[in-house]
Amino acid sequence: MADKIMLLDGHSLLNRAFYGLPDLTNAEGKHTNAVLGFLNIMLRYVEEEKPTHLLVAFDRKEPTFRHIKYKEYKGTRKPMPAELHEQVPLMKEVLKTMEIPIITQAGIEADDILGTIGKEAEEAGFDVAIVSGDRDLLQLATKKVKIKIPKTKASGTVTEDYYEEDVRELYGVSPTEFIDMKGLMGDTSDNIPGVPGIGEKTAAKIIKEYHSIENAHEHIEEIKPARAKNNLQEYYEQAIMSKDLATIKKDCEIAYDFKDAKIGTLFTKDAYQLFKELELKSLFKYFGEEEKEEETLEVVSTFDLGEIENVFASIKEEGQAALGIIGVSGNCKGLSL
């Protein structure tokens, strides 16, 4: 049976977890909902996928080659909320205690790290599962590379799994052709312009028939509707640039070793201490400790020592008595008579 590597898109999953769960803080006021949601997703998939290797890729603050090509790239994004921003280094600290490698690299995005390592892992004989909330990664799907897209809600996490054939079934195009679709329709979240007036349905129809933006342009007189034809002709260079921006690199030079991603003991002593500090009680079960509820003991009746003779007199008259042990969580807390 082939080894399997699971690659996680760090910022994407944190962001999805942050907006999918209500705000949580520990006693010190640290926000923890994104960290908890991230761990819930990761640990669920570790149980389901049973990977032998695991790593997480994060974006960096520096501009990437995409920003150099197009200054407005991601220019419309709102700043990260402070409550989420403070959880990024916290999440990295948690992963470090679990001995899960983190990869970041200046000049490229986490997507490019995932694309490069995913391709190299597939070529090395691994089965690959890439976890991200970003549908752009569908372009990386193959027969052996599965894209897992979680949707986090208060009621739980729902997952969409995509291999190459699943992308074809959904859009009618191959994962590679999906990039051309993005080039035509653009991407508002990344501020990739695309071609005005061409949305997802029209883009899918054009690429399904012509397979690439370049080939569609060569058959420009055949493109329908007329508005799409005219706009593609006018904004062709913008479409090519948008395709380039949407293309995830799979040939980056990244310093890493698959041996470092081999899963060992995720639930280390350091991880347990940090989980306790963050009060992630629902995850204590992974350390063999159930979440403990507040222990309370209600006193139903009492008597003073002056009445003790009357109690024993009643026992003598009845000829028998029952002695009960009051226990909480396996511990004796008192007696009842």
Q: Where are these predicted regions, by residue range?
A:
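Domain-level signal for Mg2+-assisted phosphodiester chemistry and nucleotide/NA-binding surfaces
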Residues: 1-101
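Long, highly charged low-complexity segments
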Residues: 257-337
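A residue-level signal for conserved active-site and pocket-lining positions in enzyme catalytic cores
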Residues: 9, 56, 114, 134, ...
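Structured, non-catalytic alpha/beta "coupling" segments that mediate domain-domain communication
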Residues: 46-57, 127-143, 149-150, 234-250, ...
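Short acidic, glycine/serine/threonine-rich loops at helix termini
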Residues: 17-20, 66-71, 140-145, 151, ...
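Extended two-metal-dependent nuclease catalytic cores across DNA- and RNA-processing enzymes
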Residues: 2, 25-26, 75-251
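Short, active-site-adjacent cap segments at secondary-structure transitions
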Residues: 13-15, 62-66, 110, 136-139, ...
